[in-house]
Amino acid sequence: MRIRKNGAEMLARAGRSSLLASVAAAALSIAPAAQAVVPNDNLSPEDIVDGTDVNGVGIMYRDDGFVCTGTLINPRTVIFAAHCVNDLSTPDYSTVNGGVPVAFAFQSDARPGLIDWISNGYRTNTALSVYNVNNIAYHPDSLDPPALSFLYGDVAMATLDTPAADVPTWTMLFSALPAPAAINETTGPGYHVTVTGYGRTGSGTTGNSVGIDFRRKTAENFLGMLGSLDDIDSFLFGAPGGYTQNLYQTDFDDPDRENPFDFNAFKDDALPNEGNTAGGDSGGPLILDQAFSEKTILGVLSGGSRYFFEQPESSYGGTSFYQPLYLFWDWIAQNNPYRYATTKAGDGKWSDADHWVTALDPNYRIIDSNGSLVNGVPTSPGAGAFGEDDAQKFGQLCYQPTDGSDNVCYDVGTDTLIVNGEPATGETQAVANAGGKTVSNNKGKVEIAERSPTAANASLNSTAQPQAEGDVSATALPDATLANGLPGASGFVPDNIDPVASQGVIGRYYDVTLSAAGTTTLDTDVTIDRFTISGGESALDITSEGSLTSEMDVAHLAGRVNVDGSLTSTGDYFLLSGLLSGSGTLRAPFLTSVMGTIAPGGVGTVGTLSVEGNAILTSGSTLHIDIGPNGASDVLAV
């Protein structure tokens, strides 16, 4: 007989009904407080402090005391969890008009940056890697009352008011991980992950017993399951709670298998640096770090569960769940304010909307038909919280208490009950009424986000203490537009727009690359985040009426740039090869020519190219000087 996918029946048929009394009756309700990465008992909180200072994972700090974690996915955008911000509307997050200021700080020890941000009127300080937020978007599904703000649709994006030019960015995986052929006793599904975040810490036994110190911590784990909260509730408590959205999930294993609260929720063994998440980690990345040649983000942290009244939060036996990015990839692409733009082949004006086309975001990843991690987007929209997710579930839910009295697992991918290591082939009689005790929808789920009980400035000067705790999978993608963020869109002009949430103005920032053959003529004032020219037959002509400002830097790798107006770069102008000419003004900290040619005025034309900054011309570069009549000549004025 086929074993029905009902955990109470599964466990009862395996001859174990006491689990329902010991676990279901002791399941805990939500606690509205926060914690951070917690190591196993073989390590101290100091041991797991991240030794890399700035790595693209940062702390989110609301000036009303809320702490979360986020990940930089481009120089302007951080991805994190909706429940960190969805208690307010987007216009409520502001440094003016009584709004709540928000910042992300990316140093491993974020305290100095956050204190500076508060002390200096909520200003970005790139030297301390702290950035003020000028807009926030969160997924509307997280506002559904049953979601309790974090159980599904828990994804958000923040826009930085200044590009984080020197902070590393992360790639995001928009494909579901493939189900393994089998679940291993030691490695589970076989996917090694890194968990990281800011906030509370402690030990495997004591849980989140140490307060937030604003330092980033990191630990390792095996991915335990791609499955829903309903899968867990059905297995442990006998009935689903109505939470069908798949989540990436991990558990916190006791390396010694002695802790009474650790019943090995997901089949795998503890790793040497095994750790669990806690509050302050909310929104932090689940990093797939060994499956491919590069690390990539699978999801953002929403929350965790504990299963006994006596069990400390974030201790051995607890589990954590992450929102899979593949379910929300199209929402992410749409709400990402950053656009990569390039030109179509042929000559055209910068101001001609038909001259431009959006390029594929270089940080978007999918798994191709060969199983390789490649730059790309899926061919159909994400299922979201309520669509039909066609991903294959994987992982085994287990009840293997430390006293050795039981060994029951359920494979969510194959719908198989496993007793003492063997698939169940028949039914055993329940010792007690299997359906007698269940857990209501939200019990056992612990929200991971922390609100400090004191003013933000005070909490930064001492250890923070917590308060009491429709099927779219087969639908074709729409036509690419600038708004939906799909590559291949046209009908726009690259020129940065700062968001104004109170007026419904959507922010847009551009990274522009000229690679196609043809000349782009700029005769207006334009500001973008970054400019690159890489095509040998590409050219940019800035007329005397034109002005280009790059908020980060300029990479002149090939092709021609003529500046008769002005070109201003916050960062350096790097001339690898190609021609830089003109009679205008170039402003940059450094103009560095490696193998390029600099021709003031232009080849065959006498003129002065002014450089407001430093100029470095290596031995491989060429300075082309024209000599005119009456002693006139080109001038490179530095």
Could you say what each language-model-derived stretch is?
Residues 138-146, 154-170, 226, 273-310, ...:
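Extended amphipathic secondary-structure runs
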Residues 343-352, 360-558, 562-565, 569-570, ...:
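Extracellular beta-sheet-rich ligand-binding/adhesion modules
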Residues 37-42, 48-50, 67, 72-86, ...:
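C-terminal subregion of chymotrypsin/trypsin-like serine protease catalytic domains
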Residues 576-638:
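Extracellular beta-strand/loop-rich repeat segments of large surface/secreted proteins
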Residues 2-79, 87-100, 401-402, 406:
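Protease-domain processing segments flanking chymotrypsin-fold serine proteases, especially trypsin-like
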Residues 54-56, 66-68, 74, 100, ...:
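Residues that flank catalytic or metal-binding motifs in active/ligand-binding sites
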Residues 152-155, 161-274:
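Chymotrypsin/trypsin-fold serine protease catalytic domain
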